[in-house]
Amino acid sequence: HSQGTFTNDYSKYMDTRRAQDFVQWLMSTXXXXXXXXXXXXXXXYADAPYISDVYSYLQDQVAKKWLKSGQDRRE
């Protein structure tokens, strides 16, 4: 009986320990992800004008291609 009590107590201790380790890991991962997200967000804002210009250019190219394909069909 004492063996079962010890095993049960040890099992509870290990569950608690794993939960604490998981929370610690989660907190450290969240802190690293928040720092990476902040750096990525700053880079995204810096790249926004370039991305916007490229997107506009690509839209223009698609529109020109569409207009040309429409003219080809009419002829």
UniProtKB/Swiss-Prot annotation:
<keyword id="KW-0372">Hormone</keyword>
<comment type="similarity">
    <text>Belongs to the glucagon family.</text>
</comment>
<dbReference type="InterPro" id="IPR015550">
    <property type="entry name" value="Glucagon"/>
</dbReference>
<dbReference type="InterPro" id="IPR000532">
    <property type="entry name" value="Glucagon_GIP_secretin_VIP"/>
</dbReference>
<dbReference type="GO" id="GO:0005179">
    <property type="term" value="F:hormone activity"/>
</dbReference>
<keyword id="KW-0964">Secreted</keyword>
<dbReference type="GO" id="GO:0005576">
    <property type="term" value="C:extracellular region"/>
</dbReference>
<protein>
    <recommendedName>
        <fullName>Pro-glucagon</fullName>
    </recommendedName>
</protein>
<dbReference type="Pfam" id="PF00123">
    <property type="entry name" value="Hormone_2"/>
</dbReference>
